């Protein structure tokens, strides 16, 4: 009976500690029964992986992790390995989401067994506290905040840390959750500068300084959230009226649909008052591209079903094919009025009756359709490039050979 050395092979097997009656508690090499041995790469339930085996065999019961053997300490949450820890032992841990979410100490969550990693150390969860160390408590970080915050360094900081609002008004310094200056006394009912607004205009009176009717979605998507939902008498970014100066009485809120306002290329001037021309309800394709000769034909050409549905000028939305819409180039000529039907941008617009039957006779007796077979009739709308079998009459099979 001999103690294991660096060579642990025994007929391509490695002996386990005494797992049967014939094996003792010590590791055996010479007289170990095959029932006590396994292949060189043991299962985790049998022994530690090969990189963790030391020169003197150690029972697997003393190995608490597949990362490091018992000689590779200290504990998992400490800063590093001991001097005897080899790089092969310092592997990354398989971080679990549950660990990262539920750990009370996220800075040291999900670290490898013997090494330290930053795989689960969000930047925004580092407390940013004031000089008073007594207030430096753990922040109640929310996952969504840490993920979506544009400034993760100051995301979800404790209450004792510096709030987002400036120090002009102490009443504004609420909890620094960056959520709502609207609900706080930032925007007073009086016309004076506040932390959430650079200031009202000079002609602003206290009676007009009411809360704006801005929707929360507007405040969320605004590029300048601090000045989003400000009093009505002040200038806003997301709901700026674009009214004509000569007619201020008609400057009411436009009936623009939210979808229109969302998809508008110029959101700042989207939902403008009724007295002004809305930008969002003027599609690019609605500009008529018609000849000036026919006024009945010169109507709007939207070429989009959505425009035709939502446009306030539906009578001129989908124009006939005598005009040239950008996306619906007509296939009919202007000479034939019967051909000027509603354009559906499909070959079905033109019938095959426009094509003249073939009068050519094939010398080789082949019923082929040559390009000359489908010469369009004057004012016919069939493309010259399409040669369909219905246009051609079968060859009479008269052969000179």
Swiss-Prot record:
Transmembrane segments: none annotated. The keyword RNA-binding does not apply. Restricted to hair root, not detected in any other tissues. Residues 36-395 are annotated as: 36 X 5 AA repeats of C-C-X(3). Disulfide bonds: none annotated. Keywords: Keratin, Repeat. GO terms for cellular component: cytosol; keratin filament. Pfam families: Keratin_B2_2. Belongs to the KRTAP type 10 family. PANTHER family: KERATIN ASSOCIATED PROTEIN, KERATIN-ASSOCIATED PROTEIN 10-1. This is Keratin-associated protein 10-4. The gene is KRTAP10-4.
């Amino acid at each position: 009976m001999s103690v294991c050395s660096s060579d642990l092979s025994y007929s391509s097997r490695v002996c386990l500690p005494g797992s049967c009656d014939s094996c003792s508690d010590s590791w055996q090499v010479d007289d170990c029964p095959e029932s006590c041995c396994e292949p060189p790469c043991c299962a985790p339930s049998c022994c530690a992986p090969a990189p963790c085996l030391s020169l003197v065999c150690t029972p697997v019961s003393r190995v608490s992790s597949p990362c490091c053997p018992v000689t590779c300490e200290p504990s998992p949450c400490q800063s590093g390995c001991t001097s005897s820890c080899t790089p092969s032992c310092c592997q990354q841990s398989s971080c679990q989401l549950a660990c990262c979410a539920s750990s009370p100490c996220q800075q040291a969550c999900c670290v490898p067994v013997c090494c330290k990693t930053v795989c689960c150390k969000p930047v925004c969860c580092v407390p940013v506290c004031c000089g008073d160390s007594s207030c430096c408590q753990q922040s109640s970080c929310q996952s969504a905040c840490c993920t979506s915050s544009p400034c993760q360094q100051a995301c979800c900081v404790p209450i004792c840390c510096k709030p987002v609002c400036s120090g002009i008004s102490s009443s504004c310094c609420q909890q620094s959750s960056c959520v709502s200056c609207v609900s706080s006394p930032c925007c007073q009912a009086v016309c004076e500068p506040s932390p959430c607004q650079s200031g009202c205009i000079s002609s602003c009176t206290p009676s007009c300084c009411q809360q704006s009717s801005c929707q929360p979605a507007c405040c969320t998507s605004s590029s300048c959230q601090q000045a989003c939902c400000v009093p009505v008498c002040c200038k806003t970014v997301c709901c700026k009226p674009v009214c004509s100066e000569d007619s201020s009485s008609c400057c009411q809120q436009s009936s623009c649909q939210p979808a229109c306002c969302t998809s508008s290329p110029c959101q700042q001037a989207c939902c403008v008052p009724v007295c002004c021309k809305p930008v969002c309800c003027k599609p690019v394709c609605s500009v008529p591209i018609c000849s000036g000769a026919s006024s009945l034909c010169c109507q709007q050409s939207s070429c989009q079903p959505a425009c035709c549905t939502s446009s306030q000028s539906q009578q001129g939305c989908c124009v006939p094919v005598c005009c040239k819409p950008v996306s619906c180039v007509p296939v009919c000529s202007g000479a034939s009025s019967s051909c000027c039907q509603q354009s559906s941008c499909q070959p079905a617009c033109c019938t095959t009756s426009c094509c003249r039957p073939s009068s050519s006779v094939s010398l080789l007796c082949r019923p082929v359709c040559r390009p000359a077979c489908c010469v369009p009739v004057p004012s016919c709308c069939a493309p010259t490039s399409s040669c369909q079998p219905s246009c051609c009459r079968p060859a009479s099979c008269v052969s000179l050979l």
